[in-house]
């Protein structure tokens, strides 16, 4: 019986289900839609009628009798890096961040486009750093992932 249990845990990690859930949520950069991207694309604020399109999430604002629509999509994660005091950056490892009491995180970027009814063409789509996401060790975005 002991051999069976040892064999099972050699093939599967104790935290395999947690890694799978985390990897399902985060954008992997392989072109597939992550759960995070699906949530962003499903956002509809200020719109009464459900709209199905590929333009991404939408926030509709009425400001001073002008309609402004903010479209958002393509959420992305960068690789975990450490920024030193002098501005230099290098790839982070979980051990380095733990020893230096830093957070092991990746920057999160998303594309935004603003459409105004008083302008004939929408503004250019712009990638914006919206925050940082802690990275789970050995996840698909971890620098130790093979």
Question: At which residue positions do the language-model features occur?
Answer:
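Conserved N-terminal architectural modules of multi-subunit, DNA-dependent RNA polymerase core subunits
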Residues: 1-145
């Amino acid at each position: 019986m002991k051999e069976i249990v040892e064999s099972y845990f050699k093939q599967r990690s104790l935290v395999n289900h947690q890694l799978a859930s985390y990897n399902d949520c985060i954008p992997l950069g392989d072109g597939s839609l992550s759960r995070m991207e699906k949530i962003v694309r499903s956002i509809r604020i200020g719109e009464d009628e459900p709209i199905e399109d590929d333009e991404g999430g939408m926030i509709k604002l009425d400001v001073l009798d002008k309609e402004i629509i903010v479209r958002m999509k393509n959420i992305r994660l960068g690789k975990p890096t450490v920024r030193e005091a002098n501005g230099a950056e290098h790839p982070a490892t979980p051990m380095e961040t733990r020893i230096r009491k830093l957070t092991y995180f990746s920057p999160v970027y998303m594309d935004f486009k603003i459409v105004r009814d008083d302008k004939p063409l929408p503004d250019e789509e712009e990638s914006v750093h919206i925050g940082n996401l802690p990275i789970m060790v050995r996840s698909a975005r971890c620098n130790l992932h093979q």
